[in-house]
Swiss-Prot record:
Single annotated GO MF: heparan sulfate binding
Protein name in the entry: Tumor necrosis factor receptor superfamily member 11B
Keyword Signal recorded: yes
InterPro entries xref list: DEATH-like_dom_sf, Death_dom, TNFR/NGFR_Cys_rich_reg, TNFR_11, TNFR_11B, TNFRSF_decoy_receptor
Record's keyword terms, sorted: Apoptosis, Disulfide bond, Glycoprotein, Receptor, Repeat, Secreted, Signal
Highest rank taxon of the organism: Eukaryota
Organism field: Mus musculus (Mouse)
One CC-aspect GO term: extracellular region
């Protein structure tokens, strides 16, 4: 009989436990020695521990966990759990310990947890590409490149890339690609011309230099009237005013003026005079020889809309190695509504500090930005701007970026 009663009580307790979990706070059974009755008490919430069981006169007393300890679920324990003291080797803190959560650690970038160790992500060999990027919990997943795709580098991030369609660039296929090599297209002067950059870094710095420290009334109209050559029409000026902020309007106007007057002697002279700047930028950036993966990482670190892997690969096909980074920065600027490229690079460099990006490249980018902001370039911009517009607005105070 006693055995039967024990079984019945256990079943009853299970039923009570199941039904009470459906309500908050969940309940638990407690024998009250004062009355001799079983009471339904509230469990303690996450972040607290049980100080006193409930009675017929008062509810359960729960108090906050002390520092460096926690509880992460509804419970009836009279103590909290100590937080893990430190993260293991090659791990960093993902979430600090608090009263409701233990300290959460994860493997540093480029590694994943395998049992107790942070191992490096697998690198896919040439002929294979990444189909699932590695995470702090999972290794990289590689797969052989299917027909029509290739990967020519060892990488833990780069996917297989589609073979170049030579006809898209007006070229002939002279050697079919395979899993490790791209199609080889016939060389053609037209291909190098397609790398054209609408506004170089130096021209952009020069055009942005022309923005006054304080915008004066009708500044854009004054500038339109002062520029030599074919005038930018009123409709275009109004469109610039509608679409862009006052600080951005000067850059947009000068960019459009340059496009309309590219065959004018004045524009040719300005471009020739900026060659000093361009050659210095090439000295800093022209020998970077970045891989597809590195170009992708740099473009990903820029704010705003991103340059796609396909655009990066297309740039690598149509531009010389010394032009690829500059072309991609130009594409980023256009895609993001002519945002300031140098400000975008400053943002990117802050984020690249935490990644395994080549320090020689970040150093070159910083040197380039310092050069474009230098006093020597300020004097050159000032000289060119005053030559371009004559003496009509020399009184306007010009600020260098």
């Amino acid at each position: 009989m006693n055995k039967w009663l024990c079984c019945a009580l256990l079943v009853l307790l299970d039923i009570i436990e199941w039904t009470t979990q459906e309500t908050l706070p969940p309940k638990y059974l407690h024998y009250d020695p004062e009355t001799g009755h079983q009471l339904l008490c509230d469990k303690c919430a996450p972040g607290t521990y049980l100080k006193q069981h409930c009675t017929v006169r008062r509810k359960t007393l729960c108090v906050p966990c002390p520092d460096h300890s926690y509880t992460d679920s509804w419970h009836t324990s009279d103590e909290c759990v100590y937080c893990s003291p430190v993260c293991k080797e090659l791990q960093s803190v993902k979430q600090e310990c608090n009263r409701t959560h233990n300290r959460v650690c994860e493997c540093e970038e480029g590694r994943y947890l395998e049992i107790e160790f942070c191992l490096k992500h697998r690198s896919c060999p040439p002929g294979s590409g990444v189909v699932q990027a590695g995470t702090p919990e999972r290794n990289t997943v590689c797969k052989k490149c299917p027909d029509g795709f290739f990967s020519g580098e060892t990488s833990s991030k780069a996917p297989c890339i589609k073979h170049t369609n030579c006809s898209t660039f007006g070229l002939l296929l002279i050697q079919k690609g395979n899993a490790t090599h791209d199609n080889v297209c016939s060389g053609n002067r037209e291909a190098t011309q397609k790398c054209g950059i609408d506004v170089t870094l130096c021209e952009e710095a020069f055009f942005r230099f022309a923005v006054p420290t304080k915008i004066i009334p009708n500044w854009l109209s004054v500038l339109v009237d002062s520029l030599p050559g074919t005038k930018v029409n009123a409709e275009s000026v109004e469109r610039i005013k509608r679409r862009h902020s006052s600080q951005e309007q000067t850059f947009q106007l000068l960019k459009l003026w340059k496009h309309q007057n590219r065959d004018q002697e004045m524009v040719k002279k300005i471009i020739q005079d900026i060659d000093l700047c361009e050659s210095s930028v090439q000295r800093h950036l022209g020998h970077s020889n970045l891989t597809t993966e590195q170009l992708l990482a740099l473009m990903e670190s820029l704010p705003g809309k991103k340059i796609s892997p396909e655009e990066i690969e297309r740039t690598r096909k149509t531009c010389k190695s010394s032009e690829q980074l500059l072309k991609l920065l130009s594409l980023w600027r256009i895609k993001n509504g002519d945002q300031d490229t140098l400000k975008g690079l400053m943002y990117a460099l802050k984020h690249l500090k935490t990644s395994h990006f080549p320090k020689t490249v970040t150093h070159s980018l910083r040197k380039t930005m310092r050069f474009l902001h230098s006093f020597t370039m300020y004097r050159l911009y000032q000289k060119l701007f005053l030559e371009m517009i004559g003496n009509q607005v020399q009184s306007v105070k010009i600020s260098c970026l």
